[in-house]
Amino acid sequence: MRLYELVLIVRPELSSTEIDKLTDELTSIISNYEGKLVKHEYWGMRSLAYKINRNQRAHYIMLAISANNNILQKLKNKIKNNLEIIRSRFIKVKEISQTTSPILKNQSLEQTAIDVTS
């Protein structure tokens, strides 16, 4: 099985429970066909570089998976038919880092930064 990172951009109107449900649907496809979810990260609500379907912001989700071509086709079909997902991208990787992704590290640094301008 090959390693992939799947990045999803999801509509901003979705609640956290709806996002969890969407993620569970995708992970169940992976596990039903003997794939493996290696890592899951929710990157939060982020601004888009440009409007996509009238959306300025969206939820970002990253799934790192071990999967074969059959699983990839099932996931692509599920994603294609799901109106909640604005964009998706499968990226083939050689290995999956177990550390926190740089996006989440930057997010946590921004939250802990002290505002010295006031």
UniProtKB/Swiss-Prot annotation:
Signal peptide stretch: none
GO cellular component, one term: cytosolic small ribosomal subunit
The keyword rRNA-binding appears for this protein: yes
Superkingdom of the organism of origin: Bacteria
Keyword set includes Cytoplasm: no
Assigned protein family: Belongs to the bacterial ribosomal protein bS6 family.
Role summary: Binds together with bS18 to 16S ribosomal RNA.
Protein name: Small ribosomal subunit protein bS6
Organism: Orientia tsutsugamushi (strain Ikeda) (Rickettsia tsutsugamushi)
